[in-house]
Amino acid sequence: MARAVGIDLGTTNSVVSVLEGGEPTVIANAEGSRTTPSVVAFAKNGEVLVGEVAKRQAVTNVERTIRSVKRHMGTDWKMKVDAKDLTPQEISAFILQKLKRDAESYLGETVADAVITVPAYFDDAQRQATTEAGTIAGLNVLRIVNEPTAAALAYGLDKGEKEQTILVFDLGGGTFDVSLLEIGDGVVEVKSTSGDTHLGGDDWDQRITDHLIKTFNGQHGVDLGKDKMALQRLREAAEKAKIELSQSSQTSINLPYITASAEGPLHLDVSLTRAEFQRMTSDLIDRCKHPFQQAVKDAGIKVSDIDHVVLVGGSTRMPAVVDLVRDLTGGKEPNKGVNPDEVVAVGASLQAGVLKGEVKDVLLLDVTPLSLGIETKGGIMTKLIERNTTIPTKRSEIFTTAEDSQPSVQIQVFQGEREMAAYNKKLGMFELTGLPPAPRGLPQIEVTFDIDANGIVHVSAKDLGTGKEQSMTITGGSALPRDDIDRMVRDAEQYAEEDRNRREEAETRNKAETLVYSTERFLAENGEKIDAAVKSDVEEKLGTLRGAVAGTDTAAIREAADALAAASQAMGQAMYEQAAQDGAGAPGSGGPADDDVVDAEIVDEEDKK
């Protein structure tokens, strides 16, 4: 079944989230970031760039770079690119396609369905345009959900025992919403909403940009507003300055070579304090008050009735906004349970889960996302628990030693899909010591993997001969970053042939070494009973196999091993015939070629050194 995702299609940044094991996960994009800039650019060669790559080249490609397209949704605005008029829906679809691709890359499967959020204050035309953008992007839009409703879901406030009134104050990059919701008994009801679809962080950025243009013009008599490349650099610097002023009381904006005059290059160097910034944007803060008051009035409640305040959107990180919300709500502290940039997408993925029947009162059985196993001789990954096994689960397998009188075995635990252990994620290592001296292949060591319902891995190794046991617990055994999980699965497919060849080589070598060892032991124990000609033939082929094992030619090893196995079989047959002729029932081995030894052997790393 194709997966459903939740998407926050934002003015400045967009986020995609998915439910995994009933829990929402924000998906990192191909660049490794959890938020994707809502920027689309058209390169000169016709390539469409989306996100961070589009934002990075904006300075040198101003004419063909589009940002904040959400502000044009539901209007007849168009942008001409290479003689083609692009609508806001088409441009938004490029962003949605990027999010869809990143989600598919992360999940390793097709994403067909999506819940997309919009500001609560979006009208029908804007909502329809958003649905169309999803359709253009190849998504089946399950539902358009109001951002405040999604935010309330994400905060998990719907799990409260008593009825609660929630204020969601959502100030994003380009839109502003205030919503009051009543939540209780699993029902989320929007009581009122108000807002401004053209008020957001972009407006605060613009005030800094205007201030820089005015300051530079006063100093040098040059209007940077008429220089598109300079203006783009100013906008980027303004956004950074705004973010810095949320953390510190002053910032410096330094842009060397911003433009040039007859005298030479000119540089911009301006300091800005938080107090100045708040003074020049005070009217924007004032614009936030009326929607709040309107929402409270429409809901028919008193400010004192508000139980929780939820801040949504990156712009709510500005100290002036936090202070405003505190003042408007009578000193109530905002709930800081979820990242304001991600909360809406998280809520959207929960809503997608509700619509797909994934979120309800049912038992959710988790699975381990990657195979678990240990490294055995030849560097092979011997899997005990395959990926997608439902947990809790327990698996055991018996291994043996690789050397005579091996005093200990080292258990190296790996997680991943590659055939060779080195290419998988190493989770841990422990040693089972105190093994009594014994020939290789004789000890029986039982390795057990046990994953509990919390996904915690317990590994134990027990010598069945002595009862000696050693164990370890791996916390977060399945808690790999999802990027690693998908990379491993993709690598496993991409390098499957290469891995298979390596595994075959290791197994061929293991079998050849076992054959050499067992043949040598057989000759030592029964040499005087074997016909000289037969013995000579076996010794010759044994020498050939020893030489092949010392080299790297797998085909030569296989050929020499087959020849020795055939000669050994003939030797065993000759012995039985001789015994029958002598009428003696002397015990003898039925041939050394196939001792009951597990091929996947554990090498003691210390022994090798």
From Swiss-Prot:
Disordered: annotated span: 572-609
InterPro entries noted in UniProt: ATPase_NBD (IPR043129), Chaperone_DnaK (IPR012725), Heat_shock_70_CS (IPR018181), HSP70_C_sf (IPR029048), HSP70_peptide-bd_sf (IPR029047), Hsp_70_fam (IPR013126)
Physiological role: Acts as a chaperone.
Residues carrying Phosphothreonine: 175
Keyword terms of this UniProt record: ATP-binding, Chaperone, Nucleotide-binding, Phosphoprotein, Stress response
Ranges of Low complexity composition bias in the record: 572-584
Protein name per the record: Chaperone protein DnaK
Description of what induces expression: By stress conditions e.g. heat shock.
Lineage of the species this protein comes from: Bacteria, Bacillati, Actinomycetota, Actinomycetes, Frankiales
Protein source organism: Frankia alni (strain DSM 45986 / CECT 9034 / ACN14a)
Domain of life: Bacteria
PROSITE patterns listed in its UniProt record: HSP70_1 (PS00297), HSP70_2 (PS00329), HSP70_3 (PS01036)
Gene Ontology MF, one: ATP binding
HAMAP family assigned to the protein according to its UniProt record, in alphabetical order: DnaK
Compositionally skewed regions (Acidic residues) per UniProt: 593-609
Coiled coil start-end: none
Family: Belongs to the heat shock protein 70 family.
